[in-house]
């Protein structure tokens, strides 16, 4: 894989191993060998297969795997969910555990819905509770104090269910953008609440400690406050917690109550998941999409991610146990926007959403075929009995033979409780020099200021080629494009180029959502997606 100047700087700063003086003692090939050989666990055939997989750039695992495989930490997962119990001991146990996870490069999600509301009686002290929002500040301060593995600051997700008595305070707790800067916050939305919004009815707020209704409030007022705050500064988000649990693969183990910080990975309390993403843009070869290569990359990637579970050293025994009982992995994609540029398909088109669904169905289907094969060789995940799979349930309907797959899982088992997740891929897509996740490109051209006041132009290579092919490329033109990052108002550029080379702000929110829905149909977990609005929205 060709490593760009930007990618090399990121790798040197955050990924390559260093000596006691902070000097890099690795290059790209060294890192690939370190990671591949460690995950393969001494298997020579696998080591070579994993070297080829990573070095080609077809697949990259999440950052903690690249950073920590083969070193003393050996903490390889990106996503964690921790329980927060309704006691001082339980709360500060979670603070400590989150600090350990952040130190090793992971992100944490929490539900604060178990904590009793503000001013609720605390019998042991004959005092009153300060409520969940006050403890958010404690978690936030602890995150500030622990810089992740010396490489990146920790990230958190806080969820409070919509029927918690402190929900109004929670919805507005980030109105000041300087508050809780290490947290994304989301309201846990239920079907009952949405029905009350639809019917313009009141709904009950219930004390998690006593189970008593503390008051009833208008659902529309709460919903409108969520919308108002989200419009003001992007928070809170909403998490459809009932819907998440409708698709919980192991309901017999417990309910999922939170996600990771970016929202694409719902997990049980004390559970973690390791993710990895395939670069779709590299699969456009000689003016056609290489489906055979994609199939092989899927098989090798599932193998790799399953081995990551075996090689991980988790910071807590409880996490190690839950992870190995469910063996969840999250295989996703990056380079989607660049693939569409190569194929000359507009992102905001039916052709693109149909291709998205076809691609993701193929990936999801073959990831499960490989997981079935691994189950035949090494056994199903231990919580298979009682899971949706043991009951012949698989929420899929598409062009491929899902009935056959469903029957195979019932009879042969499956190695992993989930196989697919679409992550944001912010840093690994930069390393791979491709577009992130399933997002459109943010800008076609941008200017970077370097030393001595020099300015460097960075032009999307697919756009650059299209402009050269049309005989329109010039540095002056690229500087003009860099002013907005978009070409939609530039009449000198032919319409057929403008239609294909759209950027995130050229695409209406409706098309962003259609694209997300097309991928989500064939994803076990969720899709991390940004919906861009105009400044006037």
Stretch-by-stretch model annotation:
Residues 3-11, 53-69, 162, 300-311, ...:
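Core structural elements
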Residues 77-291, 314, 318-321, 367, ...:
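Active-site cavity-forming subdomains of large catalytic enzyme subunits
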């Amino acid at each position: 894989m060709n490593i760009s100047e930007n990618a090399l700087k990121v790798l040197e700063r955050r990924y390559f191993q260093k000596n006691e003086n902070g000097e890099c003692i690795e290059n790209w090939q060294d890192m690939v060998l370190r990671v591949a050989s460690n995950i393969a666990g001494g298997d020579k055939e696998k080591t070579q297969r994993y070297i080829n997989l990573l070095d080609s750039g077809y697949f990259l695992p999440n950052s903690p795997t690249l950073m920590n495989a083969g070193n003393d930490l050996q903490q390889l997962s990106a996503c964690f969910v921790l329980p927060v119990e309704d006691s001082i001991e339980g709360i500060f146990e979670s603070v400590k555990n989150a600090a350990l996870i952040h130190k090793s490069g992971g992100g944490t999600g929490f539900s604060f819905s178990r904590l009793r509301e503000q001013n609720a009686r605390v019998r042991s002290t004959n005092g009153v509770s300060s409520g969940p929002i006050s403890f958010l500040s404690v978690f936030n301060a602890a995150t500030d104090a622990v810089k992740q593995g010396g490489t990146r600051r920790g990230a958190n997700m806080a969820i409070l269910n919509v029927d918690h008595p402190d929900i109004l305070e929670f919805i507005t707790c980030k109105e000041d953008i300087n508050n809780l800067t290490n947290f994304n916050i989301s309201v846990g939305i239920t079907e009952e609440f949405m029905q009350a919004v639809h019917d313009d009815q009141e709904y009950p707020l219930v004390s998690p400690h006593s189970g008593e209704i503390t008051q009833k409030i208008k659902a529309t007022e709460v919903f409108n406050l969520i919308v108002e705050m989200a419009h003001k500064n992007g928070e809170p988000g909403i998490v459809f917690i009932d819907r998440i649990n409708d698709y919980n693969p192991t309901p017999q183990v417990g309910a999922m109550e939170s996600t990771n910080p970016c929202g694409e990975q719902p997990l049980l309390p004390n559970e973690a998941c390791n993710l990895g993403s395939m670069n779709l843009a590299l699969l456009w070869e000689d003016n056609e999409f290489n489906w055979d290569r994609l199939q092989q990359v899927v098989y090798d990637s599932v193998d790799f991610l399953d081995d990551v579970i075996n090689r991980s050293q988790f910071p807590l025994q409880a996490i190690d146990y839950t992870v190995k009982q469910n063996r969840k992995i999250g295989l996703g994609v990056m380079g989607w926007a660049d693939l569409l540029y190569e194929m000359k398909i507009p992102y905001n088109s039916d052709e693109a959403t149909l291709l998205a669904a076809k691609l993701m169905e193929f990936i999801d289907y073959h990831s499960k075929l490989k997981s079935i094969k691994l189950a035949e060789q090494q056994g199903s995940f231990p919580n298979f009995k009682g899971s949706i799979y043991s009951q012949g349930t698989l929420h899929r309907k598409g062009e491929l033979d899902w009935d056959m797959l469903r029957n195979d899982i019932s009879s042969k088992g499956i190695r992993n409780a989930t196989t697919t997740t679409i992550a944001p891929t912010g840093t690994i897509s930069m390393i791979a020099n491709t577009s992130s996740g399933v997002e459109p490109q943010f800008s076609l051209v941008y200017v970077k200021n370097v030393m001595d006041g020099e300015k460097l132009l960075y032009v999307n290579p697919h756009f650059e080629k299209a402009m050269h092919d049309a005989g329109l490329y010039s540095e002056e033109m690229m500087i003009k494009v860099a002013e907005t990052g978009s070409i939609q108002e530039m009449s000198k550029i032919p319409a057929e180029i403008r239609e294909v080379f759209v950027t995130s702000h050229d695409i209406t929110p409706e098309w962003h959502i259609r694209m997300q829905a097309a991928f989500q149909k064939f994803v076990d977990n969720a899709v991390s997606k940004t919906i861009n609005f105009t400044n006037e929205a």
